[in-house]
Each structure stands twice: as structure tokens, then as C-alpha cells.
């Protein structure tokens, strides 16, 4: 059997923490920021953890 390939889109978007959870960045902070409040853009700068419902599929994409 050949080796499984990691999903290249997933490996760019998700990072594994030391405890085994997955980190992701939040949406809506790429462009059109001039009409968004500064409080919103600061809040969106923080990373979030992936929900457990999605984590199983993402880990499969990453080959973990």
C-alpha cells in the first residue's frame, strides 16, 4: 500500500497543540477591515480550538 498523503489545505490551516487539540484561525480578518470595529479585529486575532465534532475528520486529513 502507498503512503497516505496529508491534505495540503488542512495542513496550512490547522496546527496540533501539545495536548492533542487542533488550533485554527478565525475568519473575517483578511480584507475590508476599515469598516470593521477595532474591537472586532482584535478579537478575531485570537486562535480558536476546533470543535470535537470536526476534529476527528481534520485529524484524518492530517494523517494523525
Curated annotation (Swiss-Prot):
One of its GO terms (molecular function) is structural constituent of ribosome. SUPFAM superfamilies: L35p-like. GO terms for biological process: translation. PROSITE patterns: RIBOSOMAL_L35. One of its GO terms (cellular component) is cytosolic large ribosomal subunit. The keyword tRNA processing does not apply. Gene3D superfamilies: 4.10.410.60. It comes from the Bacteria. Keywords: Ribonucleoprotein, Ribosomal protein. Residues 1-28 are annotated as: Disordered. The keyword Iron does not apply. PANTHER family: 54S RIBOSOMAL PROTEIN BL35M, LARGE RIBOSOMAL SUBUNIT PROTEIN BL35M. Belongs to the bacterial ribosomal protein bL35 family. This is Large ribosomal subunit protein bL35. The lineage of its organism: Bacteria, Bacillati, Actinomycetota, Actinomycetes, Micrococcales.
Amino acid at each position: 500500500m502507498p503512503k497516505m498523503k496529508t491534505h495540503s489545505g488542512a495542513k496550512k490551516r490547522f496546527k496540533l497543540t501539545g495536548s492533542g487539540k487542533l488550533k485554527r484561525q478565525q475568519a473575517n480578518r483578511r480584507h475590508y477591515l476599515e469598516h470593521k470595529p477595532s474591537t472586532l479585529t482584535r478579537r478575531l486575532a485570537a486562535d480558536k480550538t476546533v470543535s470535537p465534532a470536526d476534529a476527528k475528520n481534520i485529524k484524518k486529513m492530517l494523517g494523525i
